[in-house]
From Swiss-Prot:
GO cellular component, one term: plasma membrane
Essential cofactor(s): Zn(2+)
Gene3D superfamilies: Helical scaffold and wing domains of SecA, P-loop containing nucleotide triphosphate hydrolases, SecA, preprotein cross-linking domain
Catalysed reaction, written as an equation: ATP + H2O + cellular proteinSide 1 = ADP + phosphate + cellular proteinSide 2
Organism: Paraburkholderia phymatum (strain DSM 17167 / CIP 108236 / LMG 21445 / STM815) (Burkholderia phymatum)
GO biological process, one term: protein transport by the Sec complex
Cell compartments where the protein resides: Cell inner membrane; Cytoplasm
SUPFAM superfamilies the record matches: Helical scaffold and wing domains of SecA (SSF81886), P-loop containing nucleoside triphosphate hydrolases (SSF52540), Pre-protein crosslinking domain of SecA (SSF81767)
Co-factor: note: May bind 1 zinc ion per subunit.
NCBIfam families: PRK12904.1, secA
Membrane topology recorded in Swiss-Prot or TrEMBL: Peripheral membrane protein
Descriptive protein name: Protein translocase subunit SecA
EC code(s) of this entry: 7.4.2.8
Annotated residues for binding of ATP: Q87, G105, E106, G107, K108, T109, D515
Length: 936
């Protein structure tokens, strides 16, 4: 109550910020008459002047009014577009490292030019981040005219681009590209073997377009560069036959044995997107697998040797029960292509992790691609937080303002619209069944069509858009379908969606990037006339004028009919996606309207709010075809959406907390890599490693401060001879000296190791040997890091079970991840020292050849893929991929062999068979099937 009272007096934080920025707007406007007097050359020369002032120490903040005024004047001359005052405010918000929420049609692309121009003056580069290649190319080509006029260079960073072109793009003052490509380039730069092979400069300033889509929707999906692992194709094919033979159980068994409506072999948790085998399901699966010869007769699926099989069983089950064709994926050209659930776009080249993608391929009977091993990965949260300054813009950020502030430290500022909005948002209508809902949608569309009003219908899946298309065909209503399958026609369809009587069906409109102008997009058609060489120059101007006159007539006609009408056929999990769909109508003060039509069969209502709404309908005795239209129901749905959003926020926050552990380690590894690449001579580093490793070896057999009776000299001599090519008569030294101590023995061994090393260097020369050492070091570091990533994945899969032992899973993960990391660094030192000490040199040329070969192997990995992998897809109930388990076991085993403190490697033979109903060996007191058996 007090807060509301104070806000009335002082205004909200948002209002105060906007008011503050309006003072700067007045200063920019005051400069306009003076800037208008400048010639083109004088205006261009301002950039050189600004650059000199920045290099002399003047701050960008002080330069802002002049730079914005110059940029606005250049835009007027080149693009024939003048920044509105609210756009200047948007530009300031971006410059100060905040998020600008601007409604659709308010000119976000033009707003970005202001802070981009200002920050590019520093010469440290600016990245403009978009959601897809089409928008990156469109915006770069469109705005390059403005930047080039002002003497700025512009680069476009696209996927599949040549390495040289990428370096040019990053060297430019301003670089446009997609979030994925910027992230992958960062990872690739940390896998190179030469400094000049890197493409990125220091991460200085980024403006992220559709910031909510990139920093929130995609934040659960780390960027992963992966290579091919072990082939299990045959096993996926065999397992694909299992799910159809199992029945779903309805209801969860409670402690008293009640709760099961229909017994079955597996249960589904649709909220968590998980599937679990029941007791009878395990028995049936074991029986079938034994019949197929995949496990021994009477053998348990929980036996250690069957963990891989368990992984495949769950992958097949999830593929059949939780992932549907034309909703979660499409089959195109013999491949399973993921559909982005937020935007409805096809995610070509992206694959689900943990064997799920292969299981879906087996289900759809297409060629099964091999499983992958992670080579490098990073989340968007950790990538974008590396920029010295980060900002973003979107039409819908206010609902996620807390998350932006909590995770990225970004404040959200809502920018006032240039003209007051006139869109009317009508109450939701809720029907009992999906068919009743679609009939109501068709009636609404027909009403709009009859009065010449354009309609945009939003659906949440490709399947629903195609079903609606069939119903419209039956009703005889002409329409356009815009979904992931028509990606190439996307912009053209959206541009014309504002014409009279136009009906457009679209999957989620997030990131579509093209404005819907009432009456159609005359500018695009005018551009086609300008570019058409077959039309004589003197005819072009009259044709374009005629086009604009026709457009004005259509524009007025559509405005009179009520503007663009938005129909939502389902509520999305996120209110923001619904708001994005609504935001397509009512741009720049145009009229418009929106309404959502829902049914109790929609996933959101069914899972989160269905019982409450159904009870209201039953109480009101609603006849078939009748809808509920009440504020209480709409609020109930919004409450369900808030619950889902809160849950998704927790998932993203938890992902970040876990990823922060590997991120700290990633920084250490990448920093070491960069130091190695830039160092001319790493002799000191190698020497320190050699001394450390040799000291550890000697101390194993001759401990510090010990007496002669405790020494194992024969074993030490053998270890030095076999592993390190050092033939030392230590026993003779002891016999000859009456008072030799452990430190003297250590010094003698270190001196011998140094001498052996120097003799190798003398054979080929310091420069050649140093190049070889660098190659060995990089190759070993990269291989160990890849194995370490797999080990962390494996550790993460089952860490939540520590909660059963009253331990904090996050703390346990941090502790064990650190132990694994320390063991990895020890194994790197050991491996590098071993190779350097054991290398047999015939000639300098041979050494150079070996170094080149190692670099070649490291930089040209087979079948490398660049993808997202959603951690929620892998699921805690599914076993870690075999490759992760094997790599983890191998690494822990290495650490033990070299004196590390990690646990002994897992061995199937050493573990006794545990029955499903036996107490879990971890000591939690639970049955094995309810504890560690769950992740098997």
């Amino acid at each position: 109550m007090t807060t509301g009272f104070l806000q009335k007096i002082f205004g909200s934080r948002n209002q105060r910020l906007v008011k503050q920025y309006q003072k700067t707007v007045a200063a920019i406007n005051a400069l306009e008459p003076q800037i208008e007097q400048l010639t083109d050359d004088q205006l261009r020369a301002k950039t050189t002047e600004f650059r000199q002032r920045v290099s002399s120490g003047e701050s960008l903040d002080k330069l802002l009014p002049e730079a914005f005024a110059v940029c606005r004047e250049a835009s007027k001359r080149v693009l024939k577009m003048r920044h509105f005052d609210v756009q200047l405010i948007g530009g300031m918000v971006l410059h100060y490292g905040k998020i600008a929420e601007m409604r659709t049609g308010e000119g976000k692309t033009l707003v970005a030019t202001l802070p981009v121009y200002l920050n590019a003056l520093s010469g440290r580069g600016v990245h403009v981040v978009t959601v897809n290649d089409y928008l990156a190319q469109r915006d770069a080509e469109w705005m390059a005219r403005l930047y080039n006029f002002l003497g700025m260079s512009v680069g476009i960073n696209l996927s599949q681009m040549d390495h040289g072109l990428k370096q040019e793009a990053y060297a430019a003052d301003i670089t446009y590209g997609t979030n994925n490509e910027f992230g992958f380039d960062y990872l690739r730069d940390n896998m190179v073997y030469e400094t000049d092979a890197r493409v990125q400069r220091t991460l200085n300033f980024a403006v992220v377009d559709e910031v909510d889509s990139i920093l929130i929707d995609e934040a659960r999906t780390p960027l992963i560069i992966s290579g091919q692992a072990e082939d299990h194709t045959e096993l996926y094919v065999r397992m694909n036959a299992l799910p159809p033979l199992l029945d779903r159980q309805i209801g969860e068994e409670k402690a008293d044995g009640t709760g099961v409506e229909k017994p079955g072999d597996y249960t589904l948790d649709e909220k968590a997107r998980q599937v679990f085998l029941t007791e009878s399901g395990h028995e049936k699966a074991e029986r079938l697998l034994a019949e197929w010869g995949l496990i021994g007769e009477g053998e348990s699926l929980y036996a250690p040797q069957n963990i891989t099989l368990m992984h495949h069983v769950y992958a097949a089950l999830r593929a059949h029960t939780l992932f549907y064709k034309d909703q979660h994926y499409v089959v195109q050209n013999g491949e399973v292509v993921i559909v982005d659930e937020f935007t409805g776009r096809l995610m070509a080249g992206r694959r689900w992790s943990d064997g799920l993608h292969q299981a879906v391929e087996a289900k759809e009977h297409v060629k099964i691609q091999s499983e992958n091993q992670t080579l490098a990965s990073i989340t968007f949260q950790n990538y974008f937080r590396m920029y010295a300054k980060l900002s973003g813009m979107t039409g819908t950020a206010d609902t996620e303002a807390y998350e932006f502030n909590e995770i990225y430290g970004l404040e959200t500022v809502v920018i006032p619209t240039n003209r007051p909005p006139k869109r009317i948002d009508k109450q939701d209508q809720i029907y009992k069944t999906a068919m009743e809902r679609y009939n109501a949608v068709i009636r609404d569309i027909r009403d709009c069509y009859d009065r010449g009003q354009p309609v945009l219908v939003g659906t949440t899946s490709i399947e629903n858009s195609e079903l609606l298309s069939q119903l419209l065909n039956k009703a005889g209503l002409p329409h356009e379908v815009l979904n992931a399958k028509q990606h190439a026609r996307e912009a053209a369809i959206v541009a014309e969606a504002g014409r009279p009587k136009r009906i457009t069906i679209a999957t989620n409109m997030a990131g579509r990037g093209t404005d819907i102008v009432l009456g159609g997009n005359a500018e695009k058609q005018a551009a086609f006339i300008e570019a058409d060489l077959s039309i004589p120059e003197e005819e072009k101007a009259p044709r374009i004028q005629k086009l604009h006159d026709e457009w004005q007539t259509l524009h007025d006609q559509v405005k009179a009919a009520g503007g663009l009408h938005i129909i939502g056929t389902e509520r999305h999990e996120s209110r923001r996606i619904d708001n994005q769909l609504r935001g397509r109508a009512g741009r720049q003060g145009d009229p418009g309207s929106s309404r959502f039509y829902l049914s109790l069969e929609d996933p959101l209502l069914r899972i989160f709010a269905g019982d409450r709404v159904r009870a209201i309908m039953d109480r009101l005795k609603m006849p078939e075809g009748e809808a509920i239209e009440a504020g209480i129901v709409t609020r109930s749905i919004e409450s369900a959406q808030r619950k889902v959003e809160a849950r998704n926020f927790d998932i993203r926050k938890q992902l970040l907390e876990y990823d922060d552990v590997s991120n700290d380690q990633r920084k250490v590894i990448y920093q070491q890599r960069n130091e190695l690449l830039e160092a001319h001579d790493i002799t000191e580093t190698i020497g320190a490693m050699r001394h450390g490793v040799i000291t550890d070896i000697v101390r194993q057999f001759v401990p510090a401060g010990s007496i002669e009776e405790q020494w194992d000299v024969p074993e030490l001599e053998e270890a030095l001879r076999n592993d390190w090519q050092l033939d030392l008569a230590i026993q003779e030294m002891i016999n000859e000296s009456q008072s030799i101590d452990p430190d003297e023995i250590l010094e003698a061994v270190l001196a011998a190791a140094d001498e052996a090393y120097e003799s190798k260097v003398e054979q080929v020369g310091r420069e050649s040997f140093s190049a070889f050492e660098r190659s060995v070091m990089l190759q070993t570091l990269d291989r160990s890091w890849r194995e370490h990533l797999a080990a962390l994945d494996h550790l993460r899969q089952g860490i939540h079970l520590r909660g059963y032992a009253q331990k904090n899973p996050k703390q346990e993960y941090k502790r064990e991840a650190f132990e694994l990391f320390a063991a990895m660094l020890d194994s790197v030192k050991l491996e590098v020292t071993r190779i350097v000490m054991n290398v047999q040199i015939q000639s300098p040329e041979q050494l150079e050849q070996a170094a080149e070969q190692m670099e070649e192997q490291g930089s040209h990995l087979e079948n490398v893929e660049f993808r997202h992998a959603d951690y929620s897809e892998g699921g805690a109930a599914v076993a870690a991929a075999p490759v992760a388990a094997n790599a983890a076991a191998a690494m822990i085993g290495d650490a033990m062999a070299h004196g590390g403190s990690a646990a002994a490697p897992f061995s199937g033979d050493a573990v006794p068979k545990v029955g499903r109903n036996d107490p879990c060996p971890c000591g939690s007191g639970k049955k094995y099937k309810q504890c560690h058996g769950k992740i098997a």
